Amino acid sequence: MARYIGPKCKLSRREGTDLFLKSGIRPLESKCKADQAPGQAAGASGRRPARLSDYGVQLREKQKVRRTYGVLEKQFRSYYKKAAASKGATGEVLLQLLEGRLDNVVYRMGFGSTRSEARQLVSHRAILVNGQSVNVASYQVKPGDQINVREKSKNQLRVKNAMELAQQRGFMPWIEVDDKKLEGTYKAKPERIDLPAEINENLIVELYSK
């Protein structure tokens, strides 16, 4: 499947928020240098940014969420259709589907420092689900599933570094992690109150409902 392989900082700055595409717990400003011409201060042109239309705001929110989870447009729309056909609030179900992706769960458990790195671990068969090798990043993890790093991959430096970052960042309440054994349990689907507050999923619902 095609993936964006360009500058990650560029995407975060375009969306005006840290999409956590680069590892580390530092703020975006210290992870990425400002995109500006040499010797030119940001905003030196004196131009006021154009005001986005309602559609523009909705589109930006969709792009922000899609890029955060590393999902291409076709698959993102598929997630929305599935959420819309499910019981419950469409926006919340959409976020639960995104959070339930195996690559995202691997990231949340601290086995990968970014979702992109977690996706690589999955594709390289370094991750087991209930003792079975799964190499599909979009695999939907179910409550009660056991996720762990394959034994021969536990000594990888990137896995150790990722866990150190996760310990500083903290773990989400819907997962349980044994940071010594590098294994965890997906206890339940996340509640909306536990999901990122900076995401406004209602804007995405409005966009696709047109």
Curated annotation (Swiss-Prot):
GO BP, sorted A to Z: ribosomal small subunit biogenesis; translation
Keyword Electron transport in annotation: no
Record-annotated S4 RNA-binding domain positions: 100-160
Keywords, alphabetical: Ribonucleoprotein, Ribosomal protein, RNA-binding, rRNA-binding
GO cellular component, one term: small ribosomal subunit
The protein's assembly and partners: Part of the 30S ribosomal subunit. Contacts protein S5. The interaction surface between S4 and S5 is involved in control of translational fidelity.
Family that this chain belongs to: Belongs to the universal ribosomal protein uS4 family.
Role of this protein: One of the primary rRNA binding proteins, it binds directly to 16S rRNA where it nucleates assembly of the body of the 30S subunit. With S5 and S12 plays an important role in translational accuracy.
Name this polypeptide is given: Small ribosomal subunit protein uS4
Organism: Alcanivorax borkumensis (strain ATCC 700651 / DSM 11573 / NCIMB 13689 / SK2)
